[in-house]
Amino acid sequence: MTMVRPFAPADLDRVMEIWLAANLQAHCFVPAEYWTGNAPQVRRQLPQAELHVYEAGGAVLGFAGLQGDYLAGIFVDGPARGRGVGRQLLDRCKALHPVLTLHVYRQNPRAAAFYRREGFAVAAEGIDPDTGQPELTMVWRRAD
């Protein structure tokens, strides 16, 4: 069975595996030590966020994390990428929030293109203060 469902505490280890692997792969322009060094803090903070997981056949293949209307990220397990997992997670977020804002690194054109296809528009450009990397602020608004 395939579904998008709320995060459960038992998902934490798998969600962290996906978070680290996805960040290392998609953001190879950021030193790996940044991601590995931040993993313990992320592990502590994730359960306080609004998380939705994509599960297929009893396995978590991806998740979306939000803080209010801020989409902190959509993370999909490598072999599951390109199969609609991210879109289903984003659809769940859109169903629950009339406005979504996110940041995406300029050097991650695949993610920026995904969000553009899904109706997000660039609202601003800036620099991520934690990594020093150029980033785009993108916004989506539900059409009424």
Protein language model annotation of sequence segments:
Residues Y70-R81, Y105:
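A short, internal acetyl-CoA/4′-phosphopantetheine-binding micro-motif in the GNAT/acyltransferase core
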Residues A95-Q107:
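Conserved GNAT acetyl-CoA-binding A-motif
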Residues G82-A95, A113-R117:
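Conserved acetyl-CoA-binding loop-helix of GNAT-fold acetyltransferases
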Residues E50-G62:
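Conserved beta-hairpin
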Residues L12, M16-R43:
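Conserved GNAT-fold acetyl-CoA-binding loop/helix
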Residues M1-A10, W140, D144:
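Conserved N-terminal entry element of GNAT/NAT acetyltransferase domains
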Residues Q41-V53, Y70:
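A short helix-loop-beta-strand connector motif used in the catalytic cores of GNAT acetyltransferases and
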Residues R116-E125:
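Conserved acetyl-CoA-binding loop of GNAT-fold acetyltransferases
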